[in-house]
């Protein structure tokens, strides 16, 4: 499954859109912030799977029920957005 399909099939869109900030940051902003960062795909995959807090303000991102492979696919797709 590709990243766009996973984005639609998982609860990502409850808080994120590609272009605009909602509860969470716009995915294009995430891509821009992480452009050129070493191992950004692995770091982002960990945030997707395990949740994170404090990177984009006070609202935490909850853990998501995804496999390691799905998290990495989603992360690589997010980072590809321009």
UniProtKB/Swiss-Prot annotation:
The keyword S-adenosyl-L-methionine belongs to this UniProt entry's keyword annotation: no
Keyword Methyltransferase (UniProt): no
TM regions (residue ranges): none
SUPFAM superfamilies associated with the record: Cytochrome c
Coiled coil: none
Modification comment: Binds 1 heme c group covalently per subunit.
Effect of residue 46 to S: In strain: 181, 217 and 191
PROSITE patterns tied to this protein: CYTC
Effect on the protein of changing residue 47 to R: In strain: 50
GO molecular function: electron transfer activity; heme binding; iron ion binding
Top-level division of the source organism's lineage: Bacteria
Organism encoding this protein: Pseudomonas fluorescens biotype C
Residues annotated for heme c binding in this entry: 12, 15-16, 61
Name listed for the protein in its UniProt record: Cytochrome c-551
Function: This is a prokaryotic monoheme cytochrome, unreactive with mitochondrial cytochrome C oxidase or reductase. It functions in nitrite and nitrate respiration in Pseudomonas, but it is also found in other bacteria.
Keywords, comma-separated and alphabetical: Electron transport, Heme, Iron, Metal-binding, Transport
